[in-house]
Each structure stands twice: as structure tokens, then as C-alpha cells.
Amino acid sequence: AVLTYFVGFNDSMIPESERYDAKETVKSVASSIENNEAVAMKFYSPADGNVVPLTEVSDQAFSSEALGKGIAVRPTNGTIVSPIAGTVSAVYPTAHAYGIKGNNNEEILVHIGIDTVKLEGKYFTPNVKTDDIVMPGDLLATIELDKIIEAGYDPTVMVIDTADSSKRNVTLLAKNTVHAKDDLVLIESI
């Protein structure tokens, strides 16, 4: 429900066959943690650009880490790629956000821009669909970066681990400038 409120959609906008149950995924990861199974995830950069700590993005839902821990990149071009290997679990109708279930059952959110849901898909072209298999660096979407900025929106791309953030440590693997698919962050269970 919190995710629905902040990213601006509801389940009725996604066909039943394309919905995923993030709560079940979070329970699965939490169970692994409780059983002392190590959970470590490396996120690769989703874009060429500048690294921004998640706590410094201009949207409180992300900067407070209420949606989970992660990292952000302010893109310098319109190519957005997958930061992990996995299966696309959701492509939002406005093409500004993507859910990916990783090969180790991690569930991540790739959210393109701040309040860009208000663009209603304008300037976003999805290049994947639900149930597609992706590898780090595979094209998720192309965006018209200049037009998003001209429309007054911050195009920062957030990559969020949606599991219980109180049980996660984040280690930055890159600072300043990155290229798509560069090592970006390591998130480990504690």
C-alpha cells in the first residue's frame, strides 16, 4: 500500500496475470535471513551518470528509506538498464518504474525520476515486459532525458531493495561518475 501511494498506481491498473506479490518475496528473503542464510546483492549501475546517495534524493519516500535501502544515479543519457539478473515482475503502466525479482529471490524496484508518474508515460519507452528474463546491463527502458528535465522533473533513477531495510547494510562500490553496468552498491543482510 505504501508503494502504491508513493509511485502513484494501484493493482487494478496492472492485469491480474502481471501482478506479483512483493510481501511474499519479502517473507522469503526474511526467512533466509532468519535461517542464517547469507543474502548479499550487488546492484550494477542502471545508467550512465552521477551517483547520488539515496538519502539525498528529493523525494521523502525514497530518501527516508521507507521503501527500502538502495542507491540513486542522476542519468546523463536516456538509456536505463537492469541493475541485476532476474525476471521482470512488473512494468508500470507509465513505464517509469520496474519491479525485478532477482535470481536469489531478492525483489527490487527501479524507479525512474521523481514524481514522473505525473507524466503518464510521456517520454518513457519500456523495452521489457513482465516475465522477461534480464541480465545486468540489459535495456529496461529508454527515456527522453532532455524533455523530462524541460518538463520540470528530476530524472534521478533509484534502485531499491524492497526487503526490510532494518536488516540491511549498504556499501557503496562507486562514487561520483558511473557507466551503465558498473558495480554500484552491495547490500548485505545483517
Where are these regions (language model features)?
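Contiguous, well-folded functional domains in the mature portion of proteins
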Residues: 4-190
